[in-house]
Every structure is written in structure tokens, then in C-alpha cells.
């Protein structure tokens, strides 16, 4: 899995379905089609039918598209999606982390119209509506367009809490957002100390990313990216390139290049 094998013909364009529950998926080289909460029916990818309130179907998935131009659907749940690769699983050098132009969806790829709060919010019986304060966490994703490490925090000040750190907007919500952090790889952030020589070797391409429902964090990184926050309160950072960014419905934080929100 490196630059020398990227075009050697020893990899395939894969279709991968994680099914229900919490999955860890790697596309590796090739132009892959990955669905964190999907299933295969006679070799074809299908979507698990679920409402945003159905916790038995959507899992909190970890997905790396790896090399190639991949299409990734996180599905329901708080998913961590990297269009390229991390350094957490033996891909320790930049040469081992080639990346292409990816299309990444935090959900199932459903169209989220203007002033729409995302997926249908009903219970399993189809009767009651999930409150607005529950919608923020149910499908809150972190998505990196290119290479990077996504961490879920388990403690502060060197103390392991024994479980994932979470937070909630008020005391009446039962769904809690998992606290996460991102480490950008093979990427040179802008700023007063920007190093153009280092940026010349950055790895990545122009990606299209849709957060869909939930409070999403999206970082386009290298290339001219197209970013959609869609429903709820999202943070979107375009990174290097001529990016097109739409926050969508909700109170969003948007940076065209690099910085902190």
C-alpha cells in the first residue's frame, strides 16, 4: 500500500458493507464504494433502513478510504471518516498514504434541502418526533478529506476516565456527542509561518463531502473541495485550495482556508 503499488494492478475497486453495529473499515487501494451501515444483496450494495432514532441499526463506524478515489457513506451513528489514510495502522510514512479525490457522506447520501433538519426524526413505531436537542448528537460525524488521525478522547490532564468523553447541550437530552480530535497528516496548514516548500509535497485531492444530519466537523484539507454541512450545527474548514462551502441549516462555523473555530 504505497506509491509504488498504486498503479501496479494488484488491487481492486471494492464494494464494502459494514452492516449494523460499530465497524472498522479500510478500503485500501482502488476506487472503493464503502457503506458503514450497509449490506450486500446478491453482490449489490443496499442501505439498512432506519430512522435517526433507531439505535439498533446505525453504528459508530471508523472508516478509512485509503488510496484511490473512494465513495464512502458513514450511515447512521457518530462516524469517524478519513478519505485517505491514518498513521495508526502501520501506514507510517507519506509514501504509504497515497490519496485520490473522494466523495464522502456522513449519512446515507440523502439529499438535505434548505431549512431541512436532516433525516426523518421519528421513533421505531413512526409516532413521536425526536426533540431538536437529540438531533445534534445522533449522527454527529468527524470527516477528513485526505490523510489524518482521528482520536476519541477518554480523559483529560493525563487521567483516563475509563470511557469516552461526551457532552450534551442541556440536561434534557439523552444523546451525547463524543469528543474527538484530529491530527492532520501530509498537509501544510496556512498561516503566517506557511512553508510553500513543504506544501509542495502535501498529499490529497479535491473532495466532495456531505455532513448530512448531526453536528459534524469537516476538514477538506488539500485540493479544491466542495463541502456541505447540511443539517444541525457544523464546523467546516476548507483548507488549501479554491473551496466551495455551504454550512446548511443550523448555526455553523465556516473557514475557507485554515484556522480554529
What is the meaning of each model-derived region?
Residues 1-261:
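Acidic, glycine-rich low-complexity segments
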Amino acid at each position: 500500500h504505497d506509491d509504488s503499488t498504486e498503479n501496479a494492478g494488484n488491487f481492486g475497486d471494492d464494494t464494502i458493507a459494514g452492516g449494523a453495529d460499530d465497524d472498522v473499515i479500510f478500503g485500501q487501494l482502488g476506487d472503493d464504494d464503502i457503506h458503514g451501515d450497509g449490506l450486500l444483496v446478491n453482490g449489490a450494495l443496499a442501505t439498512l433502513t432506519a430512522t435517526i432514532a433507531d439505535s439498533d441499526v446505525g453504528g459508530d463506524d471508523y472508516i478509512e478510504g485509503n488510496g484511490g478515489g473512494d465513495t464512502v457513506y458513514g450511515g447512521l451513528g457518530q462516524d469517524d471518516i478519513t478519505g485517505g489514510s491514518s498513521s495508526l495502522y502501520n501506514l507510517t510514512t507519506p509514501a504509504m498514504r497515497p490519496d485520490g479525490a473522494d466523495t464522502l457522506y456522513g449519512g446515507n447520501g440523502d439529499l438535505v434541502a434548505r431549512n431541512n433538519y436532516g433525516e426523518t426524526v421519528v421513533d421505531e413505531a413512526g409516532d413521536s418526533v425526536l426533540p431538536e436537542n437529540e438531533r445534534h448528537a445522533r449522527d454527529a460525524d468527524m470527516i477528513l478529506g485526505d490523510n489524518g488521525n482521528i482520536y476519541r478522547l477518554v480523559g483529560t490532564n493525563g487521567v483516563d476516565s475509563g470511557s469516552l468523553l461526551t457532552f450534551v447541550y442541556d440536561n434534557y437530552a439523552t444523546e451525547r456527542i463524543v469528543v474527538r480530535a484530529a491530527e492532520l497528516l501530509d498537509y501544510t496548514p496556512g498561516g503566517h509561518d506557511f512553508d510553500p516548500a513543504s506544501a509542495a509535497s502535501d498529499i490529497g485531492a479535491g473532495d466532495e463531502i456531505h455532513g448530512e444530519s448531526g453536528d459534524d466537523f469537516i476538514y477538506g484539507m488539500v485540493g479544491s473541495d466542495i463541502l456541505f454541512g447540511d443539517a444541525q450545527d457544523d464546523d467546516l474548514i476548507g483548507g488549501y485550495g479554491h473551496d466551495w462551502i455551504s454550512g446548511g441549516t443550523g448555526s455553523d462555523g465556516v473557514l475557507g482556508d485554515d484556522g480554529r473555530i
